[in-house]
């Protein structure tokens, strides 16, 4: 199993009142990719990190093998979701992948 964790910060121009809606849209659409993209076994979304966190939200995914992360990143369904619900609203991205 390979785990892929991605964290983001909102762009400064995203209104505080809009952040909860944006997080909900990200969660719904990123989670919907399970079953659509080969090798993607699970996805969970962190909408409410604790105060000591450096990022506003995170996606935690599990894949069968490391190669599946590369295929996921360019899969048309993932690109569509990222281009519509994630990239327009985030400014900073951090990623950590690990195998257990």
Give the predicted meaning of each segment.
Residues 66-96:
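C-terminal structural segments of small proteins and small subunits
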Residues 1-56, 64-74, 97-100:
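Short S/T/G/P-rich N-terminal loop/turn motif that feeds into the first structured element of a domain
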């Amino acid at each position: 199993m390979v785990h892929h964790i991605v964290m983001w910060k909102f762009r400064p121009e995203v209104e505080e009142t809009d952040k909860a809606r944006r997080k909900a849209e990200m969660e719904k659409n990123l989670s919907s990719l399970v079953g659509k993209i080969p090798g993607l076994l699970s996805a969970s979304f962190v909408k409410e990190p604790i105060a000591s966190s450096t990022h506003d939200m995170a996606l935690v995914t599990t894949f069968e093998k490391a190669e599946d992360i590369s295929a996921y990143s360019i899969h048309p369904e993932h690109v569509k979701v990222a281009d519509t619900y994630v990239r327009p609203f985030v400014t900073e991205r951090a990623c950590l992948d690990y195998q257990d």
